[in-house]
Curated annotation (Swiss-Prot):
Entry keyword annotation includes Transmembrane: yes
Keyword Transport applies: yes
Periplasmic side: 25-41, 90-92, 152-157, 238-246, 292-294, 354-357
Gene from which the chain derives: mdtL
An annotated Gene Ontology molecular function: transmembrane transporter activity
Entry membrane topology: Multi-pass membrane protein
GO cellular component, one term: plasma membrane
InterPro entries for this protein: MFS (IPR011701), MFS_dom (IPR020846), MFS_trans_sf (IPR036259), Multidrug-R_MdtL (IPR023697)
Family stated for the protein in its record: Belongs to the major facilitator superfamily. DHA1 family. MdtL (TC 2.A.1.2.22) subfamily.
Membrane-spanning segments: 4-24, 42-62, 69-89, 93-113, 131-151, 158-178, 217-237, 247-267, 271-291, 295-315, 333-353, 358-378
The entry's keywords: Cell inner membrane, Cell membrane, Membrane, Transmembrane, Transmembrane helix, Transport
Location of the protein in the cell: Cell inner membrane
Residue ranges annotated as Cytoplasmic topological domain: 1-3, 63-68, 114-130, 179-216, 268-270, 316-332, 379-395
Name of protein: Multidrug resistance protein MdtL
Amino acid sequence: MKRFLLCSFALVLLYPAGIDMYLVGLPRIAVDLNASESQLHIAFSVYLAGMATAMLFAGKIADQSGRKPVAIVGAIVFMMASLLCSRASEGSLFLSGRFLQGIGAGGCYVVAFAILRDTLDEHRRAKVLSLLNGITCIVPVLAPVVGHLIMLRFPWQSLFYTMSAMGIIVGLLSLFILRETRPVRLAPRDLSRSSPAAESLINRFFVSRLAITTLSVSVILTFVNASPVLLMEVMGFSRGDYAITMALTAGVSMVVSFSTPFALGLFKPRTLMLVSQGLFLTAGVTLSLAHTNTVTLFGLTLICAGFSVGFGVAMSQALGPFSLRAGVASSTLGIAQVCGSSLWIWLAAILGISAMNMLIGILIGCSIVSILLIFSVAPNRSVAEHEEIPYQSRP
Protein backbone atom coordinates (compact mmCIF):
# COMPACT_ATOMS: atom_id res chain seq x y z
CA MET A 1 0.00 0.00 0.00
CA LYS A 2 2.87 2.39 0.77
CA ARG A 3 4.08 2.18 -2.82
CA PHE A 4 0.70 3.35 -4.12
CA LEU A 5 0.58 6.29 -1.71
CA LEU A 6 4.17 7.30 -2.50
CA CYS A 7 3.57 7.18 -6.25
CA SER A 8 0.21 8.97 -6.03
CA PHE A 9 1.70 11.79 -3.98
CA ALA A 10 4.63 12.12 -6.41
CA LEU A 11 2.31 12.15 -9.44
CA VAL A 12 0.12 14.89 -7.99
CA LEU A 13 3.06 17.11 -6.97
CA LEU A 14 4.07 17.75 -10.58
CA TYR A 15 0.92 19.87 -11.00
CA PRO A 16 1.60 22.54 -8.32
CA ALA A 17 5.37 22.43 -8.92
CA GLY A 18 4.78 23.35 -12.56
CA ILE A 19 2.76 26.37 -11.44
CA ASP A 20 4.90 27.76 -8.62
CA MET A 21 8.52 26.79 -9.23
CA TYR A 22 9.25 29.21 -12.07
CA LEU A 23 7.43 32.31 -10.77
CA VAL A 24 10.45 33.66 -8.91
CA GLY A 25 12.39 33.72 -12.18
CA LEU A 26 9.68 35.43 -14.22
CA PRO A 27 11.34 38.89 -14.36
CA ARG A 28 14.62 37.39 -15.60
CA ILE A 29 12.80 35.14 -18.08
CA ALA A 30 10.95 38.17 -19.49
CA VAL A 31 14.24 40.02 -20.05
CA ASP A 32 15.98 37.08 -21.75
CA LEU A 33 13.00 36.30 -24.01
CA ASN A 34 12.35 39.96 -24.88
CA ALA A 35 8.82 39.74 -23.49
CA SER A 36 6.96 41.64 -20.80
CA GLU A 37 6.06 40.02 -17.50
CA SER A 38 2.38 40.57 -18.29
CA GLN A 39 2.79 38.65 -21.56
CA LEU A 40 4.44 35.75 -19.77
CA HIS A 41 1.75 35.66 -17.08
CA ILE A 42 -0.40 33.95 -19.73
CA ALA A 43 1.89 30.96 -19.16
CA PHE A 44 -0.34 30.09 -16.19
CA SER A 45 -3.44 29.88 -18.38
CA VAL A 46 -1.52 27.98 -21.06
CA TYR A 47 -0.38 25.47 -18.43
CA LEU A 48 -3.97 24.93 -17.24
CA ALA A 49 -5.10 24.56 -20.86
CA GLY A 50 -2.53 21.81 -21.30
CA MET A 51 -3.80 20.08 -18.19
CA ALA A 52 -7.41 20.24 -19.39
CA THR A 53 -6.38 18.88 -22.80
CA ALA A 54 -4.61 15.92 -21.21
CA MET A 55 -7.57 15.20 -18.97
CA LEU A 56 -9.82 14.83 -22.02
CA PHE A 57 -7.93 11.68 -23.02
CA ALA A 58 -5.85 10.47 -20.06
CA GLY A 59 -8.74 9.06 -18.03
CA LYS A 60 -10.15 6.90 -20.81
CA ILE A 61 -6.69 5.69 -21.83
CA ALA A 62 -5.91 4.83 -18.19
CA ASP A 63 -9.13 2.79 -17.94
CA GLN A 64 -8.38 0.92 -21.16
CA SER A 65 -4.58 0.52 -21.11
CA GLY A 66 -3.72 0.92 -17.45
CA ARG A 67 -2.64 3.55 -14.95
CA LYS A 68 1.08 2.79 -15.18
CA PRO A 69 1.62 3.58 -18.91
CA VAL A 70 -0.18 6.92 -18.59
CA ALA A 71 1.86 7.82 -15.50
CA ILE A 72 5.15 7.00 -17.24
CA VAL A 73 4.25 8.88 -20.43
CA GLY A 74 2.97 11.87 -18.43
CA ALA A 75 6.22 12.07 -16.45
CA ILE A 76 8.31 11.82 -19.64
CA VAL A 77 6.27 14.58 -21.33
CA PHE A 78 6.65 16.80 -18.25
CA MET A 79 10.40 16.18 -18.20
CA MET A 80 10.88 16.89 -21.92
CA ALA A 81 8.63 19.96 -21.79
CA SER A 82 10.65 21.36 -18.88
CA LEU A 83 13.81 20.99 -20.96
CA LEU A 84 12.06 22.74 -23.86
CA CYS A 85 11.21 25.69 -21.60
CA SER A 86 14.82 25.88 -20.43
CA ARG A 87 16.02 26.06 -24.05
CA ALA A 88 13.45 28.63 -25.17
CA SER A 89 14.87 31.71 -26.86
CA GLU A 90 11.57 33.51 -27.45
CA GLY A 91 8.13 33.73 -25.87
CA SER A 92 6.13 31.46 -28.18
CA LEU A 93 8.53 28.54 -27.70
CA PHE A 94 8.40 29.06 -23.94
CA LEU A 95 4.59 29.02 -23.98
CA SER A 96 4.63 25.86 -26.11
CA GLY A 97 6.78 24.22 -23.47
CA ARG A 98 4.39 25.35 -20.75
CA PHE A 99 1.44 23.84 -22.63
CA LEU A 100 3.27 20.51 -22.92
CA GLN A 101 4.20 20.70 -19.25
CA GLY A 102 0.49 21.00 -18.48
CA ILE A 103 -0.24 17.94 -20.61
CA GLY A 104 2.31 15.89 -18.67
CA ALA A 105 1.12 17.12 -15.29
CA GLY A 106 -2.55 16.61 -16.23
CA GLY A 107 -2.00 12.98 -17.20
CA CYS A 108 -0.18 12.28 -13.94
CA TYR A 109 -2.85 14.10 -11.91
CA VAL A 110 -5.68 12.02 -13.35
CA VAL A 111 -3.82 8.75 -12.79
CA ALA A 112 -3.04 9.60 -9.16
CA PHE A 113 -6.72 9.89 -8.24
CA ALA A 114 -7.59 6.76 -10.22
CA ILE A 115 -4.92 4.80 -8.31
CA LEU A 116 -6.33 5.95 -4.97
CA ARG A 117 -9.83 4.93 -6.09
CA ASP A 118 -8.49 1.51 -7.12
CA THR A 119 -6.68 0.79 -3.87
CA LEU A 120 -8.59 2.49 -1.02
CA ASP A 121 -12.11 2.23 0.36
CA GLU A 122 -14.14 5.41 0.85
CA HIS A 123 -13.20 5.99 4.49
CA ARG A 124 -9.44 5.59 3.97
CA ARG A 125 -9.57 7.42 0.64
CA ALA A 126 -11.15 10.51 2.21
CA LYS A 127 -8.37 10.59 4.81
CA VAL A 128 -5.62 10.15 2.21
CA LEU A 129 -7.08 12.81 -0.09
CA SER A 130 -7.15 15.24 2.84
CA LEU A 131 -3.50 14.47 3.56
CA LEU A 132 -2.73 14.86 -0.13
CA ASN A 133 -4.38 18.26 -0.10
CA GLY A 134 -2.18 19.26 2.82
CA ILE A 135 0.97 18.13 1.05
CA THR A 136 0.08 20.04 -2.12
CA CYS A 137 -0.37 23.16 0.03
CA ILE A 138 3.31 22.89 0.97
CA VAL A 139 4.44 23.31 -2.65
CA PRO A 140 3.26 26.93 -3.15
CA VAL A 141 5.22 27.85 -0.02
CA LEU A 142 8.39 25.84 -0.63
CA ALA A 143 8.64 26.13 -4.43
CA PRO A 144 9.33 29.91 -4.53
CA VAL A 145 11.85 29.53 -1.70
CA VAL A 146 13.65 26.69 -3.50
CA GLY A 147 13.49 28.69 -6.72
CA HIS A 148 15.00 31.73 -5.00
CA LEU A 149 17.85 29.65 -3.57
CA ILE A 150 18.54 28.14 -6.98
CA MET A 151 18.63 31.54 -8.66
CA LEU A 152 21.10 32.91 -6.13
CA ARG A 153 23.80 30.93 -7.94
CA PHE A 154 22.31 29.68 -11.19
CA PRO A 155 20.35 31.16 -14.16
CA TRP A 156 16.58 30.81 -14.52
CA GLN A 157 17.01 27.79 -16.79
CA SER A 158 18.02 25.84 -13.67
CA LEU A 159 14.43 26.13 -12.41
CA PHE A 160 13.27 24.07 -15.37
CA TYR A 161 16.19 21.68 -15.02
CA THR A 162 14.91 21.08 -11.48
CA MET A 163 11.39 20.42 -12.79
CA SER A 164 12.85 18.11 -15.41
CA ALA A 165 14.61 16.19 -12.63
CA MET A 166 11.28 15.92 -10.81
CA GLY A 167 9.76 14.43 -13.96
CA ILE A 168 12.59 11.89 -14.14
CA ILE A 169 12.07 10.90 -10.50
CA VAL A 170 8.32 10.49 -10.98
CA GLY A 171 8.93 8.48 -14.15
CA LEU A 172 11.34 6.15 -12.35
CA LEU A 173 8.88 5.69 -9.48
CA SER A 174 6.12 4.90 -11.97
CA LEU A 175 8.35 2.46 -13.85
CA PHE A 176 9.94 0.55 -10.97
CA ILE A 177 7.79 1.12 -7.87
CA LEU A 178 4.22 1.57 -9.10
CA ARG A 179 2.20 -1.56 -9.77
CA GLU A 180 -0.72 -1.61 -12.17
CA THR A 181 -4.03 -1.12 -10.35
CA ARG A 182 -6.48 -1.09 -13.25
CA PRO A 183 -9.19 -3.67 -12.42
CA VAL A 184 -8.85 -6.92 -14.36
CA ARG A 185 -11.76 -8.65 -12.73
CA LEU A 186 -13.96 -7.96 -9.75
CA ALA A 187 -15.25 -10.28 -7.12
CA PRO A 188 -17.89 -12.65 -8.59
CA ARG A 189 -20.71 -11.00 -6.68
CA ASP A 190 -19.95 -7.69 -8.45
CA LEU A 191 -19.82 -8.94 -12.02
CA SER A 192 -23.56 -8.63 -12.65
CA ARG A 193 -23.76 -4.98 -11.72
CA SER A 194 -20.25 -3.52 -12.17
CA SER A 195 -19.61 -2.73 -15.79
CA PRO A 196 -18.50 0.40 -17.60
CA ALA A 197 -22.04 0.86 -18.91
CA ALA A 198 -23.47 0.67 -15.38
CA GLU A 199 -21.05 3.31 -14.08
CA SER A 200 -22.64 6.28 -15.81
CA LEU A 201 -21.25 9.76 -15.26
CA ILE A 202 -24.77 11.12 -15.68
CA ASN A 203 -26.22 10.34 -12.27
CA ARG A 204 -27.47 12.75 -9.64
CA PHE A 205 -24.93 11.85 -6.99
CA PHE A 206 -21.82 12.20 -9.18
CA VAL A 207 -23.09 15.40 -10.81
CA SER A 208 -23.81 16.90 -7.39
CA ARG A 209 -20.29 16.13 -6.11
CA LEU A 210 -18.80 17.35 -9.37
CA ALA A 211 -20.64 20.65 -8.88
CA ILE A 212 -19.51 20.94 -5.25
CA THR A 213 -15.84 20.25 -6.02
CA THR A 214 -15.87 22.54 -9.07
CA LEU A 215 -17.35 25.41 -7.07
CA SER A 216 -14.86 24.78 -4.25
CA VAL A 217 -11.90 24.87 -6.65
CA SER A 218 -13.36 28.04 -8.17
CA VAL A 219 -13.29 29.58 -4.69
CA ILE A 220 -9.66 28.73 -3.98
CA LEU A 221 -8.42 29.70 -7.46
CA THR A 222 -10.35 32.98 -7.32
CA PHE A 223 -8.66 33.64 -3.99
CA VAL A 224 -5.21 32.89 -5.45
CA ASN A 225 -5.92 34.96 -8.57
CA ALA A 226 -7.33 37.93 -6.65
CA SER A 227 -4.86 37.85 -3.74
CA PRO A 228 -2.18 40.12 -5.30
CA VAL A 229 -4.77 42.83 -5.99
CA LEU A 230 -6.50 42.45 -2.63
CA LEU A 231 -3.36 42.36 -0.51
CA MET A 232 -0.98 44.70 -2.35
CA GLU A 233 -3.28 47.21 -4.06
CA VAL A 234 -6.38 47.33 -1.86
CA MET A 235 -4.76 46.60 1.52
CA GLY A 236 -1.41 48.24 0.74
CA PHE A 237 0.84 45.29 1.58
CA SER A 238 4.42 45.14 0.30
CA ARG A 239 5.69 42.17 -1.70
CA GLY A 240 7.30 40.83 1.46
CA ASP A 241 4.08 41.21 3.44
CA TYR A 242 2.20 39.51 0.61
CA ALA A 243 4.58 36.54 0.62
CA ILE A 244 4.32 36.17 4.40
CA THR A 245 0.52 36.37 4.30
CA MET A 246 0.25 33.73 1.58
CA ALA A 247 2.66 31.50 3.50
CA LEU A 248 0.51 31.84 6.61
CA THR A 249 -2.70 31.01 4.71
CA ALA A 250 -0.95 27.97 3.22
CA GLY A 251 0.04 27.01 6.76
CA VAL A 252 -3.62 27.16 7.80
CA SER A 253 -4.50 24.91 4.86
CA MET A 254 -1.83 22.40 5.86
CA VAL A 255 -2.88 22.27 9.51
CA VAL A 256 -6.56 21.80 8.64
CA SER A 257 -5.80 19.22 5.93
CA PHE A 258 -3.62 17.15 8.26
CA SER A 259 -6.29 17.39 10.98
CA THR A 260 -9.16 16.29 8.74
CA PRO A 261 -8.27 12.54 8.84
CA PHE A 262 -8.67 12.65 12.62
CA ALA A 263 -11.93 14.57 12.28
CA LEU A 264 -13.25 11.84 9.96
CA GLY A 265 -12.87 9.42 12.85
CA LEU A 266 -15.23 11.56 14.91
CA PHE A 267 -17.68 13.04 12.41
CA LYS A 268 -19.54 11.90 9.32
CA PRO A 269 -18.25 13.04 5.91
CA ARG A 270 -21.48 14.95 5.37
CA THR A 271 -20.86 16.94 8.56
CA LEU A 272 -17.39 17.98 7.41
CA MET A 273 -18.73 18.98 4.00
CA LEU A 274 -21.36 21.17 5.67
CA VAL A 275 -18.69 22.70 7.92
CA SER A 276 -16.64 23.46 4.81
CA GLN A 277 -19.48 25.28 3.11
CA GLY A 278 -20.42 27.02 6.35
CA LEU A 279 -16.87 28.40 6.53
CA PHE A 280 -17.16 29.61 2.92
CA LEU A 281 -20.44 31.36 3.69
CA THR A 282 -18.99 32.92 6.85
CA ALA A 283 -15.95 34.07 4.86
CA GLY A 284 -18.15 35.68 2.22
CA VAL A 285 -20.20 37.56 4.82
CA THR A 286 -17.06 38.56 6.74
CA LEU A 287 -15.36 39.97 3.63
CA SER A 288 -18.49 41.85 2.59
CA LEU A 289 -18.70 43.53 6.02
CA ALA A 290 -14.96 43.98 6.64
CA HIS A 291 -13.69 47.52 7.27
CA THR A 292 -10.21 46.69 8.57
CA ASN A 293 -7.31 44.62 7.28
CA THR A 294 -7.49 42.35 10.32
CA VAL A 295 -11.09 41.35 9.60
CA THR A 296 -10.29 40.87 5.91
CA LEU A 297 -7.36 38.58 6.75
CA PHE A 298 -9.63 36.58 9.06
CA GLY A 299 -12.06 36.10 6.17
CA LEU A 300 -9.26 34.95 3.86
CA THR A 301 -8.13 32.46 6.51
CA LEU A 302 -11.64 30.99 6.65
CA ILE A 303 -11.46 30.35 2.89
CA CYS A 304 -8.33 28.21 3.26
CA ALA A 305 -9.78 26.31 6.21
CA GLY A 306 -13.08 25.68 4.43
CA PHE A 307 -11.44 24.32 1.30
CA SER A 308 -9.09 22.04 3.24
CA VAL A 309 -11.74 20.48 5.45
CA GLY A 310 -14.20 19.58 2.69
CA PHE A 311 -12.49 19.13 -0.67
CA GLY A 312 -10.87 15.75 -0.02
CA VAL A 313 -14.11 14.34 1.38
CA ALA A 314 -16.15 15.56 -1.61
CA MET A 315 -13.61 14.17 -4.10
CA SER A 316 -13.66 10.80 -2.35
CA GLN A 317 -17.45 10.66 -2.56
CA ALA A 318 -17.38 11.66 -6.23
CA LEU A 319 -15.02 8.79 -7.13
CA GLY A 320 -16.87 6.25 -4.98
CA PRO A 321 -19.36 4.88 -7.56
CA PHE A 322 -16.65 4.07 -10.14
CA SER A 323 -14.76 0.78 -10.02
CA LEU A 324 -14.06 0.33 -13.73
CA ARG A 325 -14.20 3.97 -14.90
CA ALA A 326 -12.18 5.67 -12.17
CA GLY A 327 -9.88 7.22 -14.78
CA VAL A 328 -12.74 8.76 -16.75
CA ALA A 329 -14.40 9.97 -13.54
CA SER A 330 -11.13 11.55 -12.38
CA SER A 331 -10.67 13.22 -15.79
CA THR A 332 -14.22 14.59 -15.73
CA LEU A 333 -13.70 16.05 -12.27
CA GLY A 334 -10.39 17.63 -13.27
CA ILE A 335 -11.74 19.14 -16.49
CA ALA A 336 -14.81 20.56 -14.75
CA GLN A 337 -12.70 22.07 -11.97
CA VAL A 338 -10.13 23.66 -14.29
CA CYS A 339 -12.63 24.91 -16.87
CA GLY A 340 -15.31 25.94 -14.38
CA SER A 341 -12.97 28.04 -12.27
CA SER A 342 -11.34 29.59 -15.35
CA LEU A 343 -14.78 30.45 -16.77
CA TRP A 344 -15.83 32.22 -13.58
CA ILE A 345 -12.62 34.26 -13.37
CA TRP A 346 -12.88 35.15 -17.07
CA LEU A 347 -16.54 36.17 -16.85
CA ALA A 348 -15.89 38.28 -13.75
CA ALA A 349 -13.04 40.05 -15.53
CA ILE A 350 -15.17 40.66 -18.65
CA LEU A 351 -17.99 42.08 -16.53
CA GLY A 352 -15.57 44.34 -14.68
CA ILE A 353 -16.29 42.86 -11.26
CA SER A 354 -13.73 43.95 -8.66
CA ALA A 355 -11.39 41.39 -7.08
CA MET A 356 -13.16 41.57 -3.72
CA ASN A 357 -16.66 41.25 -5.20
CA MET A 358 -15.47 38.42 -7.43
CA LEU A 359 -14.33 36.53 -4.33
CA ILE A 360 -17.41 37.35 -2.25
CA GLY A 361 -19.72 36.31 -5.09
CA ILE A 362 -18.18 32.87 -5.59
CA LEU A 363 -17.99 32.27 -1.82
CA ILE A 364 -21.68 32.96 -1.23
CA GLY A 365 -22.80 31.27 -4.45
CA CYS A 366 -20.69 28.17 -3.80
CA SER A 367 -21.85 27.78 -0.21
CA ILE A 368 -25.57 28.16 -0.95
CA VAL A 369 -25.58 25.81 -3.95
CA SER A 370 -23.36 23.23 -2.23
CA ILE A 371 -25.39 23.16 0.99
CA LEU A 372 -28.56 22.60 -1.03
CA LEU A 373 -26.89 19.76 -2.95
CA ILE A 374 -25.53 18.12 0.22
CA PHE A 375 -29.00 18.06 1.78
CA SER A 376 -30.88 17.06 -1.38
CA VAL A 377 -28.48 14.48 -2.87
CA ALA A 378 -27.09 12.19 -0.19
CA PRO A 379 -25.16 8.95 -0.80
CA ASN A 380 -27.65 6.17 -1.43
CA ARG A 381 -27.53 2.40 -1.35
CA SER A 382 -26.64 2.07 -5.02
CA VAL A 383 -23.62 4.31 -4.52
CA ALA A 384 -22.53 2.35 -1.47
CA GLU A 385 -22.86 -0.93 -3.36
CA HIS A 386 -20.58 0.31 -6.12
CA GLU A 387 -17.89 1.18 -3.59
CA GLU A 388 -15.68 -1.80 -4.37
CA ILE A 389 -11.93 -2.23 -4.43
CA PRO A 390 -10.68 -4.30 -7.39
CA TYR A 391 -10.44 -7.96 -6.46
CA GLN A 392 -7.37 -8.45 -8.62
CA SER A 393 -4.93 -6.01 -10.19
CA ARG A 394 -2.18 -6.54 -12.66
CA PRO A 395 1.18 -7.48 -11.10
